Amino acid sequence: MSKTLALTEELIALSSVTPEDKGCQSRLIELLSPLGFVCETIESDGVTNLWARKGTAQPLLVFAGHTDVVPTGPLDQWTSPPFVPTQRDGKLYGRGAADMKTSIAAMVVAAEEFVHAHPDHKGSIGFLITSDEEGPATDGTVIVCNALKARGEQLDYCVVGEPTSSDVLGDTIKNGRRGSMSGKLTVKGIQGHIAYPQLARNPIHQCAPALAELVAEKWDDGNEYYLPTSWQVSNMHGGAGASNVIPGNVVIDFNFRFCTASTVEGLQQRVHAILDKHGLEYDLKWSISGYPFLTPKGSLSDAMADAIKSETGVTTELSTTGGTSDGRFIAQICPQVVEFGPPNGSIHKIDEHIEVRFIDPLKNIYRHTMENLLL
């Protein structure tokens, strides 16, 4: 059994449902410390984070990831227990197999091989690992990034091990992500008997034209890296629970996935302008869970694309599609951030898995990336 496969199975067996780490990072420290990494555990509100660094020189290449996994869902629907790593039909099954314990194992083994082969490499290597990526993500990577920024540690490159590949290993690198901004809109009416609408004010009826306009609005055209900004309603709550009562208010939750062609302030102003145009009495609270980030084609993406081509023969594509990731925090302190990992077709699903044939090539790609940047 390859070392990467063995370590992947070790990590899957640790039932680290978010925000638990369940000893995953302790195992990583056991492996990294003998290589010369200075390992620091940073805890915050029940979340375990690891910052490990070998060397003090620039450039600093960081590998980032998360040890937490999403809940299993109904256990009786799994073909084999989710925290018992099981191989069958050329695949390794278990929660976290694709997202993202294989990536972490591959990164660590790649670093071990690289350090042993090139003890006098230039620059430094770092690991930023959290147990709070699948949850609120308020006490994980963002906490470590703030600590690194406060003490002036400069990151030059970062590879996040998210499962970015689509069909085969290496077909997609994420070089950015859209931002995410949510709004909670409360439209106020006047509650009353449904038979006497003239004595009430129905907020659902009132807000319908405004919602239709928001749905139809073209927020931007996107750009060469991003799809256009999208606006979607996620929840709508109104009514007193009776069929003969006009509600006093309606609450609408919505979300923007926005690209660099728009700004937070600009989107907010346009929403308020539409609501005001329709004469609504309303309250609107905003929350931003991430700003868009983008690493244009350059030394990091080129180094990884070359590593992928050398190992797999696949010509990779750069993409910014998908949801948010911890890359949004790292991009605030690191000029070049990309995400790369195994195929994502089974992530968060029952019977999550990775094809065994991809495991060692993934490790080799991470190692070749180190060689391209630090030799």
UniProtKB/Swiss-Prot annotation:
Cofactor note: Binds 2 Zn(2+) or Co(2+) ions per subunit.
Binding site residues for Zn(2+) 2: D99, E134, H348
Tagged with keyword tRNA-binding: no
Keyword Amino-acid biosynthesis: yes
Key words, A-Z: Amino-acid biosynthesis, Cobalt, Diaminopimelate biosynthesis, Hydrolase, Lysine biosynthesis, Metal-binding, Zinc
Source domain of life: Bacteria
InterPro entries for this protein: Bact_exopeptidase_dim_dom, DapE_proteobac, Peptidase_M20, Peptidase_M20_dimer, Peptidase_M20A
Annotated catalysed reactions: N-succinyl-(2S,6S)-2,6-diaminopimelate + H2O = (2S,6S)-2,6-diaminopimelate + succinate
Listed cofactors: Zn(2+); Co(2+)
Pathway note: Amino-acid biosynthesis; L-lysine biosynthesis via DAP pathway; LL-2,6-diaminopimelate from (S)-tetrahydrodipicolinate (succinylase route): step 3/3
Chain positions recorded as Zn(2+) 1 binding sites: H66, D99, E162
GO MF terms, alphabetically ordered: acetylornithine deacetylase activity; cobalt ion binding; succinyl-diaminopimelate desuccinylase activity; zinc ion binding
Any single GO BP term: lysine biosynthetic process via diaminopimelate
Record-stated family: Belongs to the peptidase M20A family. DapE subfamily.
PANTHER family: ACETYLORNITHINE DEACETYLASE (PTHR43808), N-ACETYL-L-CITRULLINE DEACETYLASE (PTHR43808:SF31)
Job of this protein: Catalyzes the hydrolysis of N-succinyl-L,L-diaminopimelic acid (SDAP), forming succinate and LL-2,6-diaminopimelate (DAP), an intermediate involved in the bacterial biosynthesis of lysine and meso-diaminopimelic acid, an essential component of bacterial cell walls.
Subunit structure: Homodimer.
Record protein name field: Succinyl-diaminopimelate desuccinylase
The encoding gene: dapE
